[in-house]
Amino acid sequence: MTDRKTNLPEEPIFEEAEDDGCPSIENSSHLSVPTVEENKDFSEYNGEEAEEVVVPEKPASAYATVSIMCLCMAFGGFMSGWDTGTISGFVNQTDFLRRFGNYSHSKNTYYLSNVRTGLIVSIFNVGSAIGCLFLSKLGDIYGRCMGLIIVIVVYMVGIVIQIASIDKWYQYFIGRIIAGIGAGSISVLAPMLISETAPKHIRGTLLACWQLMVTFAIFLGYCTNYGTKTYSNSVQWRVPLGLCFAWAIIMIGGMTFVPESPRFLVQVGKIEQAKASFAKSNKLSVDDPAVVAEIDLLVAGVEAEEAMGTASWKELFSRKTKVFQRLTMTVMINSLQQLTGDNYFFYYGTTIFKSVGMNDSFETSIVLGIVNFASCFFSLYSVDKLGRRRCLLLGAATMTACMVIYASVGVTRLYPNGKSEPSSKGAGNCTIVFTCFYIFCFSCTWGPVCYVIISETFPLRVRSKCMSVATAANLLWGFLIGFFTPFITSAINFYYGYVFMGCLAFSYFYVFFFVPETKGLTLEEVDEMWMDGVLPWKSESWVPASRRDGDYDNEKLQHDEKPFYKRMF
């Protein structure tokens, strides 16, 4: 490895949170507006004085090996997707209702109350949020791969408890919490490992494979529910739960072939292994100059971080490194992903389509699962072709239109003679069609892109902590939507769609003003862009310092005198 001196700034480049606990976010539409000195310090800190690392791009077919490895990591999304696809059917199956529900003497049938339904469906997300915040740090201690294997075992323990439940709903409830803890940790560690391993020009596509696996699992979950619904015993729900062991074992087996993150290996001083990992991912020889230069940059960055001491949770509120602004943006994006209303359909799809008069709502759920899964293949192309911002903006606009039609038809046309009378078949079919189109738009845009954004936004020093917080925000909103949806739909029915419509309209404006474009940049270049103070709506024109020519004017990207409405249209 070539000798390299790391020039550190005399003062730490991060700043602890102010005493009042809340840093100012004035002019927060800027990624930042740093001084010349701050930019200089940051460049030194990241080793940017070195020559540009040139990793030659190859055709997609040349990356078959790294693509398969990333698919093994992305298979972690199967855990969460399988739960989403199966739980929506469980709460409508006769044996499940008999064991864990209440008996209605007047109707001579078993049922789940709104409270119990909400808790059983949504508590998985609470466990996932706990796993994000507390177990995902195993990836910093034992490595991303070993950390993943440990949390998969935790997930399996939760599944055992659920299968062993006889007639106590709270035992099943506890099992879902523990399984959620494992799945939540996986949802941080797996995308992190993909982002740190994948070549930059196909990183977005490989990260989108996470959502592909989620949607594939949802579809298979729907199919499994349909296949077991004719049984009258616990086969209805225990067989789908038992299949979780197969998914866990497949992922553990896959992880034995996946190389460790080169960034983590550099962090623990295993330089030669880091070279081998980076070379394998980029189809280069270990001695290739691009490999040596990239690892040298990582070493310089890690040495700078070590000189500043151990990263603390307080550092998440740092303004000089712009971590607080990045964290705020990713928390908002992850929250808005849930507020698009996707899990309203995925958690309660079977129940929703019963209400619109479908003879077999399980069959309708399978149709939704097919649309959801097939749509994700478009995202593998669009996320790196169109970019992150355009995908989110296009998705927000189209989903808003779909939700307006869905809610309006449900409110005005579904029950022309009142709720006590049969629903309109034509209106019911219309709601299903626009639900399918909504899911298509979601799966092509917001579904995968949010995982891409949170995986490539943060510096290595605080990446694990920040991704944990951002993912936990997503899961907590998932819990709130899952828990309160039965109560809300009982009170306002299809007016609920207008709530999601408002959130989608807001998300369009938020993305435009606060989310930068990171397509085609290395993780270190993403850091540099944030420190350069580029306006998000001008970020597509930003060029890293190592590739700028004499005509490049970075200041033009930091200011915009146009009124906000002229910036958008």
UniProtKB/Swiss-Prot annotation:
Region Disordered: start-end pairs: 1-38
Is Transmembrane helix one of the keywords?
Answer: yes
Q: Where in the cell is it found?
A: Membrane
Going by the UniProt record, its keywords in alphabetical order are:
Glycoprotein, Membrane, Repeat, Sugar transport, Transmembrane, Transmembrane helix, Transport
Q: Which GO terms describe its molecular function?
A: carbohydrate:proton symporter activity; D-glucose transmembrane transporter activity; fructose transmembrane transporter activity; mannose transmembrane transporter activity
Q: Does the keyword Transport apply?
A: yes
GO CC annotations on file: cell periphery; plasma membrane
Cytoplasmic membrane side: 1-61, 140-145, 198-203, 260-342, 384-390, 455-471, 515-569
Q: Which parts of the chain span the membrane according to its record?
A: 62-82, 119-139, 146-166, 177-197, 204-224, 239-259, 343-359, 366-383, 391-411, 434-454, 472-492, 494-514
Tell me one GO biological process term: hexose transmembrane transport
Question: Could you tell me which CDD domains the record lists for this protein?
Answer: MFS_HXT
Q: Where is the composition biased (Acidic residues)?
A: 12-21
Q: Which InterPro entries does the entry mention? A: MFS_dom, MFS_sugar_transport-like, MFS_Sugar_Transporters, MFS_trans_sf, Sugar/inositol_transpt, Sugar_transporter_CS
Family in the record: Belongs to the major facilitator superfamily. Sugar transporter (TC 2.A.1.1) family.
- Reported function: Probable glucose transporter.
What other comment is given for this protein? Present with 623 molecules/cell in log phase SD medium.
Task: Provide the protein name.
Answer: Hexose transporter HXT8
Q: Which organism is it from?
A: Saccharomyces cerevisiae (strain ATCC 204508 / S288c) (Baker's yeast)
